[in-house]
């Protein structure tokens, strides 16, 4: 399957922005603590923790920092009292948006999320309003690689799909619980991924034009600026021509 790696570009853009803000490690540590608290400190027996570990390593977090966060979760650190909250809504141009949060104060979090939507021409929806448009998947990404080699190793390891893009990037899609196992198998075959993360993949896309794309980007930026927001997923499709103007 060929195409342009817009989803990969979105992930890379987000990672760069989060790193610039100095927030990405804070958010990853919060997820590590919570995952360890809820499912135990063994990544092999805790898919959510394994996904958080993979994300931490993809963002160059040291093993020492990572292990301390897991220990905090297992030991009942205060951060482990966070709960996962999912908000759904519609953004500019009819984009479907899902926001994954970790919070110890629902009222604070929903107020911040609602404010971002109202400032950017969107609407916070009810539970289930857009969730049906997304599927939770593991995404293992290679910026470059041999398509046949990666595809053979990935499918043999249990991957669901392998997508090659026009720019040479390759994404391997897995059941989210199997992402760690598939990544291990790829590494055992000498194929080191550039990133691995659990994501919500949309089944449909909403085309953004020169008017709606900047509004969508502003909404995403505002949501990602919220301390309680861990991830923002959307189905906005931005062409190369429009992206060049942003």
Curated annotation (Swiss-Prot):
One of its GO terms (molecular function) is DNA binding. One of its GO terms (cellular component) is cytosol. The keyword Translocase does not apply. Residues 1-20 are annotated as: Disordered. Its main location: cytoplasm. Keywords: Cytoplasm, DNA-binding, Transcription, Transcription regulation. It is found in: Cytoplasm. It comes from the Bacteria. SUPFAM superfamilies: YebC-like. Pfam families: TACO1_YebC_N (PF20772), Transcrip_reg (PF01709). One of its GO terms (biological process) is response to ionizing radiation. NCBIfam families: PRK00110.1, PRK12378.1, YebC/PmpR family DNA-binding transcriptional regulator. Belongs to the TACO1 family. This is Probable transcriptional regulatory protein YebC. It comes from Escherichia coli (strain K12).
